[in-house]
């Protein structure tokens, strides 16, 4: 927060700044929004130039429905994680999450517990790089591929979870035996 105050005073003294990131678009799943909010509250004009954002190409490559989606970003590491996974498991749209390669397998295991083995999902890694990979399958198949190293647990990871399907109502036929 001290950096925000320093940058704000720099801008207010008449200097221009540029907010850049080596991890995608600033403000998407990072604290860059704090600076942007402070600048806007101070009446500073903020302009955004389009740039790399991992979740858009991941959504396209996944083949999952893209007409409606929910961007979660990084899940909480500890506090509230299981509650959040329960909430996410009930969403009827595609859910997009970022995950560390070191927590990828655990995350898929947790998704299986909350969503079931057959929920469709996709792991996309290393977008726009030489080892780019997008694997869409059931959660249980994705876990199997992680266990056999068909999906390396390296690089930048995007997990896309298919939405919860509406339960089909089954008509019950009643018969009376006399």
Give residue ranges: language-model regions.
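Short gly/pro/ser/thr-enriched loop/turn and capping motifs at secondary-structure boundaries
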Residues: 26, 53-56, 129-130
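Conserved phosphate/pyrophosphate-binding and hydrolysis machinery centered on Walker-type P-loop NTPases
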Residues: 25, 29, 75-78, 97-101, ...
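A contiguous loop/helix-start segment that scaffolds small-molecule binding in enzyme catalytic cores
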Residues: 12-16, 93-178
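Short, hinge-like loop/turn segments at secondary-structure boundaries
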Residues: 9-11, 35-38, 62-67, 114-115, ...
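General beta-strand structural signal in soluble alpha/beta enzymes
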Residues: 21, 48-51, 97, 123
């Amino acid at each position: 927060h001290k950096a925000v105050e320093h940058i704000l005073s720099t801008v207010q003294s008449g200097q221009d700044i540029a907010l850049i990131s080596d991890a995608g678009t600033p403000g998407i799943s990072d604290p860059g929004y704090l600076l942007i909010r402070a600048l806007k509250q101070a009446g500073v004009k903020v302009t955004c130039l389009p740039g790399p954002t991992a979740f858009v190409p991941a959504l396209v490559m996944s083949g999952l429905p893209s007409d409606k989606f929910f961007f979660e970003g990084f899940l909480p590491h500890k506090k509230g994680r299981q509650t959040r996974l329960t909430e996410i498991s009930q969403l009827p749209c595609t859910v997009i999450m970022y995950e560390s390669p070191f927590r990828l397998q655990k995350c898929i295991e947790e998704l299986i517990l909350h969503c079931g083995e057959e929920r469709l999902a996709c792991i996309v890694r290393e977008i726009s790089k030489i080892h780019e990979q997008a694997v869409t399958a059931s959660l249980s198949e994705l876990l199997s591929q992680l266990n056999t190293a068909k999906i390396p647990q390296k690089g930048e990871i995007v997990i896309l979870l298919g939405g919860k399907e509406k339960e089909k109502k089954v008509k019950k036929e009643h018969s009376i035996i006399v």
